[in-house]
Amino acid sequence: MHAEHSVAQDAFTEKHNSGYSLSPQIYYANMYFAMAEICDTLQKDLKKSIEFKQKGTTILNNVKSQYWNAEKGCFASGPRGSEAYEKGIWEATGAEACVWPKFHVSDHQQRQIFLQTIKTQKNALNDFGLNWYPFEEGKNHFWNTCWVSWTEGIAVAANHEGDMELLRKLIFQQVRNVVVNKTFHEAVDYSTGRAWRWPGLTWHASAFLGYFMFGLLGMSYEKEGLLISPCIPQEFSHMKLCNLRYRDAVFEIEICGSGNQFDIYVDDSKTEFIDVAIKGRHRVMLCPKH
């Protein structure tokens, strides 16, 4: 699918991607899957559903075969034959979409390798955030800038791979931003940590909570209910999350230790899964396995 720039920005043509930037491919593939799901749920246009699934699968297979550069340890922001692929150039939104398990792009090994690349790539990750464009030397509100919402999926990937060091770093980047600025800015300067653009943004406040819900607690919403797969660094070993609404239920979630192997208790009953039909107020305890 022709796309001259990543979803990270809407101002510049990214010539090194040869007209086929990575992140839009992933979003469009999942758009087709979502449209198919709507058709199936409503039991309407079922022929269209098949067509949508085929299109989504084709795009996703192309991403897997054309953008993964094993030598550079990344999903490049352009396909095979592009400058981005040859040099192993990547950007944050493509990286996030590739490693976020819900988008079904990377396998376990690729996810681990790419997370390691993100951690070790020069000019990619510091105490202030993830640089949207680690390979660009200029500075504007896209280049050498961190945008708060766009690393949540990397936090989820860190949870899946049990990478507490990375998960901890990603969360504390956001804690720092909030404590220092006392509001939710969108753009943070990668070099200085100065939050300089668009304060008070509700979707970045939501993303801040998402680091805890989906990164730390490993929550995922399924048709049948709610899954919780915690990965808890020591600093969060006694955290409470109160008044969390899930459909017709309200949860008080309490963490009782650290690690990535937990038993889940709802009102003192051990469970692997919280059913979608649950109602009322409930206490959810996350207890390390012994």
Region locations from a protein language model:
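Well-ordered alpha-helical scaffold segments within catalytic/enzyme domains
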Residues: 26-45, 95-108, 152-164, 211-220
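Solenoid-repeat scaffolds in large eukaryotic assemblies
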Residues: 49, 56, 110-111, 166-167
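Active-site neighborhood of glycoside hydrolase catalytic domains
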Residues: 22-67
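C-terminal extensions
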Residues: 33-38, 56, 62, 87-97, ...
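Conserved aromatic-histidine-acidic binding/catalytic patches
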Residues: 16, 20-23, 44, 48-51, ...
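Aromatic- and histidine-enriched alpha-helix N-cap/loop-to-helix transition segments
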Residues: 19-30, 88-93, 145-153, 162, ...
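Non-catalytic C-terminal accessory modules of carbohydrate-active enzymes
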Residues: 156-290
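Extended glycan-interaction surfaces of carbohydrate-active proteins
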Residues: 1-20, 61-148, 169-192, 217, ...
